[in-house]
Amino acid sequence: MIQLKKGSKKLLNAWAFYDWANSVYTLTIASSIFPLFYSSLFNSKDELVSAFGFQMKQEVLIMLVTAFTFLVVVFLSPILSGIADYVGNKKNFMKFFCYLGSAGCIGLYWFDLNYIHLSLLFYFMGLIGYWGSLVFYNSYLPDIAFEDQQDSISAKGFSMGYIGSVLLLVINLAMVMSQEDEAGAIKMMKYSFITVGIWWALFSQYTFYILPSGVSSGHKVTKYVIFNGFRELKEVWKQLKQNLRLKRYLNAFFVFSMAVQTIMLMAVYFGEKEIDWASDSEKTTGLIVSILVIQLVAIAGAILTSKASSKYGNIKTLIAVNFIWMFLCVYAYFIKTP
């Protein structure tokens, strides 16, 4: 295939299309159906789970595995990105994490408390596959798009991700709600995990077909190359010390991102545990529909925020949005009924 030129429409669309492929993971697995499925495995909200030689609360176990996965990603990202840049095969790394995540999603079909460690391995694979592939996916942007194209194509990727993930969630929602009993609903949830894995791997093929593979350098991977990513981070940190404004921004973003990611990952567990639902069926339907509505509101919110930024500026808009978000988080603390 002819190598597409940097900035070409076809190349940019192929890059953005990966959001369509992988965003189904964050919506179906991380945010909606898997948390409901996981909670349904226990007889009561307070039932403990045994794993790694400890007895702990259900949601604590998932939080610990999630936190560990993020630590692994943080440690591996500089190493793998350094190797990929040196050897010239970032697409292969992106493929590896994509297929790892896809296999993990499909493996969740066999999630069973009797085999909790194997089950958590599948969960770990899905999570690290998603975030690991994003490292290389995002690194492609400056290679394929000119600076004046990057904002628009990133926004297009987010939009495609929203649309694709909502589309599959609607299908999964119909599957779950079509069942008359809890056992049937749980079965459909497990099938939903398979659809996510297949969707992710299948639709990513177009992206992999179009994106450049990179020029192989023929260099061997040495100890120096493996840790070169950390050396680059060290140099970046030295430069940050000289730019006080950028340093403050990154510190603020760290705190902001930590809060947002916590809400995104734990919202359904909170809704399942703290809200007084009339029945399990109402809980399942209510939480999934809530997640779906949130996605639709997010699309409208992104459009309104973009317009507000154009009129009032990014800083003022961001401050206003953060205050609204903080108010809603505090308000959610006092909610007890649907």
Where in the sequence are the language-model features?
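Pair of pore-lining "gating" transmembrane helices in MFS-fold secondary transporters
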Residues: 6-45, 124, 243-263
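Hydrophobic core of transmembrane alpha-helices in multi-pass small-molecule transporters
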Residues: 104, 115-133, 255, 338
